[in-house]
Curated annotation (Swiss-Prot):
<dbReference type="GO" id="GO:0042450">
    <property type="term" value="P:arginine biosynthetic process via ornithine"/>
</dbReference>
<keyword id="KW-0028">Amino-acid biosynthesis</keyword>
<feature type="binding site">
    <location>
        <position position="166"/>
    </location>
    <ligand>
        <name>substrate</name>
    </ligand>
</feature>
<comment type="similarity">
    <text>Belongs to the acetylglutamate kinase family. ArgB subfamily.</text>
</comment>
<keyword id="KW-0808">Transferase</keyword>
<keyword id="KW-0418">Kinase</keyword>
<dbReference type="InterPro" id="IPR001048">
    <property type="entry name" value="Asp/Glu/Uridylate_kinase"/>
</dbReference>
<feature type="site" description="Transition state stabilizer">
    <location>
        <position position="226"/>
    </location>
</feature>
<dbReference type="GO" id="GO:0005737">
    <property type="term" value="C:cytoplasm"/>
</dbReference>
<dbReference type="GO" id="GO:0005524">
    <property type="term" value="F:ATP binding"/>
</dbReference>
<dbReference type="InterPro" id="IPR001057">
    <property type="entry name" value="Glu/AcGlu_kinase"/>
</dbReference>
<comment type="function">
    <text>Catalyzes the ATP-dependent phosphorylation of N-acetyl-L-glutamate.</text>
</comment>
<dbReference type="InterPro" id="IPR036393">
    <property type="entry name" value="AceGlu_kinase-like_sf"/>
</dbReference>
<feature type="site" description="Transition state stabilizer">
    <location>
        <position position="14"/>
    </location>
</feature>
<dbReference type="InterPro" id="IPR004662">
    <property type="entry name" value="AcgluKinase_fam"/>
</dbReference>
<keyword id="KW-0963">Cytoplasm</keyword>
<keyword id="KW-0067">ATP-binding</keyword>
């Protein structure tokens, strides 16, 4: 993998919801990255598991612009599933492969501090600040951090409000990559690549081009927070990519060979 000037070997990886599938190879790839001397930092979501447990508990799932409206009861489920079940399943899988890993949430050591986005979406929040102290301590101890995006509700918290927030894992990944000045930010998702205005798959794009895709509305749905996070990371000197995590060993292929999905660089590329 080609390193940037800082060469700190940190790779921030946003894991898609398929990582617990027995056929998924992402966690095996992470073991290989460790052997190559890289320092993976994992951020995960788990929306489908949250929705499944919400249904079991008789709670309605409501979405606004693709993000979960998080009322008081839903926040309980989000915290229990993301910071608990999903996080520990990933940690256990890594431990089973011989990788030292520790599961944390954004609440631990105030790693991710946030604020409520809007009253109508409840405890759905946005990142205000990232504290890298705990993440760095784990990396220094050769322990792979596995981070749930459940975060600390501190900024502008109304009196009587809860101290937890549900924050989308995509922007959390971008903010953490930026704060760590990571070498790479990688999104493992369920599409082959970012698409251009004519539906064509885009291989390498500049930060400016990514911004144009967002401004024009060409990027839509779940691709919006991913591209925004890629832009955040490139401003800190990282390169970022979005690849299809459904294909075997795409993570290791991207980080050793490249050109597996869409790479966003901070450079200004000449485009036709």
């Amino acid at each position: 993998m080609e390193m940037t000037q800082s060469s700190n070997h940190i790779v921030v990886i946003k894991l898609g919801g398929s990582v617990l599938d027995s056929k998924d190879t992402s966690l095996k790839d992470i073991a290989t990255l460790k052997q190559l001397g890289l320092k993976p930092v994992l951020i995960h979501g788990g929306a489908s598991t949250v929705s499944a447990w919400s249904a079991k508990l008789g709670l309605e799932t409501r979405l606004v612009n693709g993000e979960r409206v998080t009322d008081d009861a839903t926040l309980d489920v989000v915290a229990a599933i993301l910071a608990g079940l999903v996080n520990k399943e990933i940690v256990a899988a890594l431990l089973d492969m011989g990788i030292k890993a520790a599961g944390i949430s954004g609440v631990d050591s105030a790693t991710i501090t946030g604020q409520i986005r809007a009253t109508e979406t409840g405890y759905l929040g946005d990142v205000v600040q990232v504290n890298t102290e705990l993440i760095t301590a784990l990396l220094d101890a050769n322990i792979t951090p596995v981070i749930s995006p459940v975060s600390f509700h501190q900024t502008n918290r109304p009196s009587g409000s809860r101290r937890l927030l549900n924050i989308n894992g995509d922007p959390v990944a971008g903010e953490i990559a930026s704060a760590l000045q990571a070498e790479r930010l990688v999104f493992l998702t369920d599409v082959p690549a970012v698409k251009g205005k004519n539906g064509e798959a885009l291989g390498e794009i500049s930060a400016d081009h990514a911004a144009e895709l967002l401004a024009s509305g060409t990027a839509s749905g779940g691709m919006i927070p991913k591209l925004r996070s890629c832009l955040k990371a490139t401003l800190a000197g990282s390169s970022a990519c979005i690849i299809d995590g459904r294909k075997p060993h795409m993570l290791i292929r991207e980080l050793t060979e490249g050109n597996c999905g869409t790479t966003v660089t901070g450079q200004h590329l000449r485009r036709s």
